C-alpha cells in the first residue's frame, strides 16, 4: 500500500503520534510525515505510506499557509501559550494601525532566529531538551520568506492573521517578533495549517473519520505519488526509457513523449502508463558518459505498466 494521506491533525497530539496512529489504522510500519506541527497546532499534516515516503523530501520543499492567533502583553519562554510567562507589559496603547504597520513590515525575506524550544538539534540533542534543562545555546538564523500576511481580526490584546511563508518558518517566532516590534511582547495562542504545497485543509481527513471507516475502504483516501507531486512538471516516458529506468539509467530527451519546454535544472516527475516512475532534474548539458539527459533523484516502482 503506497500513497499520501492528508490528515487534519488534532490539537494536543504530536506529529509523531499521528504517524503512530496511521501505522495502526493501515497496518503498515513504513509511514512518515512532511513538516512537523507542534502539539498546539491543528490542520494539514501530509502523511506518506509505503513507497510514498520516498517523496517526502520533495513535499517538504513547499511553502505553507497558516492561520495564527496571538495575544499581546505577555512573552513566554516557548513563544506560545504552552510555555511559562517570562515578561508582561500593558498593551493598552497599541492601536489597529500600529498592528497593521508592524505586520506589513514582516513581509519579505529575512533571517529568522529559531526558538530554543524547537526540534532543531545541537550536537545531536534536540534544542527543546536543552531548553528544558535551562540551557540556552547559540543558533544560526535561517533565511525565510513571508510572502503575505493578512490581518483577519485586531481586537487588542488579541490578533488573528493568515500568513503565507516558506518552509522552515516558525510562526510562533513571527508572533514573538510582532510583540517585540510593538514594544509589548506577544505569544502564539492558536495555530492552524491551512495549506501545505498543493494540499488544502479542505481535503484533509480527521483521525476519527478514518477510524470509523471499514479497514478495506481506507486505501481510497490515499493520493497516488503522481497526484501528490502534481505541482511539479511531468513528462511521459516512452517504453525504451521506462526499461532504462528499471536499471537505474536516466532516459534521454528523445525517449520523452512530451515537448520539453522548461529550463535546465528544473525538477520533473517522470511518468509511465501506471503512474510515477521517478523524480529527476533536467540536465541536457551533462557529460555523455553520465548517460541520459536527466539526473535521477528518486526512482519508484509505480508506473511502468497499467
Swiss-Prot record:
Keyword list, A-Z: Isomerase, tRNA processing
Disulfide bonds listed in the record: none
Catalyzed reactions per annotation: uridine(55) in tRNA = pseudouridine(55) in tRNA
Enzyme class: isomerase
GO biological process: mRNA pseudouridine synthesis; tRNA pseudouridine synthesis
Family as reported in the entry's similarity comment: Belongs to the pseudouridine synthase TruB family. Type 1 subfamily.
Its biological purpose: Responsible for synthesis of pseudouridine from uracil-55 in the psi GC loop of transfer RNAs.
Protein name, UniProt field: tRNA pseudouridine synthase B
Source organism of this protein record: Syntrophotalea carbinolica (strain DSM 2380 / NBRC 103641 / GraBd1)
Gene name of this polypeptide: truB
Amino acid at each position: 500500500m503506497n500513497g499520501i494521506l492528508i490528515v487534519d491533525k488534532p490539537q494536543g497530539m504530536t506529529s509523531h503520534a499521528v504517524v503512530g496512529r496511521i501505522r495502526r489504522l493501515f497496518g503498515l510500519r513504513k509511514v512518515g510525515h512532511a513538516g512537523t506541527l507542534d502539539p498546539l497546532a491543528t490542520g494539514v499534516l501530509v502523511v506518506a505510506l509505503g513507497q510514498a515516503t520516498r517523496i517526502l523530501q520533495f513535499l517538504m520543499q513547499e511553502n505553507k499557509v497558516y492561520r495564527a492567533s496571538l495575544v499581546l502583553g505577555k512573552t513566554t519562554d516557548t513563544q506560545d501559550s504552552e510555555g511559562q510567562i517570562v515578561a508582561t507589559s500593558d498593551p493598552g496603547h497599541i492601536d489597529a494601525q500600529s498592528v497593521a504597520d508592524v505586520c506589513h513590515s514582516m513581509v519579505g525575506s529575512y533571517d529568522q532566529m529559531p526558538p530554543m524550544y524547537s526540534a532543531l538539534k545541537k550536537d545531536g540533542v534536540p534544542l527543546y531538551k536543552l531548553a528544558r534543562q535551562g540551557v540556552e545555546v547559540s543558533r544560526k538564523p535561517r533565511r525565510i520568506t513571508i510572502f503575505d500576511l493578512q490581518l483577519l481580526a485586531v481586537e487588542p490584546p488579541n490578533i488573528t492573521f493568515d500568513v503565507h511563508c516558506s518552509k522552515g518558518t516558525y510562526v510562533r517566532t513571527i508572533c514573538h517578533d510582532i510583540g517585540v516590534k510593538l514594544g509589548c511582547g506577544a505569544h502564539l495562542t492558536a495555530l492552524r495549517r491551512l495549506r501545505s504545497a498543493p494540499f488544502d485543509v479542505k481535503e484533509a481527513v480527521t483521525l476519527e473519520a478514518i477510524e470509523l471507516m471499514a479497514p478495506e475502504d481506507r486505501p481510497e483516501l490515499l493520493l497516488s505519488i503522481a497526484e501528490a507531486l502534481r505541482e511539479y512538471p511531468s513528462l511521459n516516458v516512452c517504453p525504451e526509457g521506462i526499461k532504462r529506468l528499471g536499471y537505474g539509467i536516466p532516459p534521454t530527451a528523445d525517449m520523452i513523449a512530451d515537448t520539453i519546454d522548461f529550463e535546465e535544472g528544473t525538477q520533473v516527475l517522470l511518468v509511465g502508463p501506471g503512474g510515477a516512475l521517478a523524480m529527476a532534474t533536467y540536465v541536457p548539458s551533462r557529460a555523455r558518459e553520465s548517460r541520459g539527459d536527466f539526473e535521477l533523484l528518486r526512482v519508484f516502482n509505480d508506473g511502468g505498466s497499467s
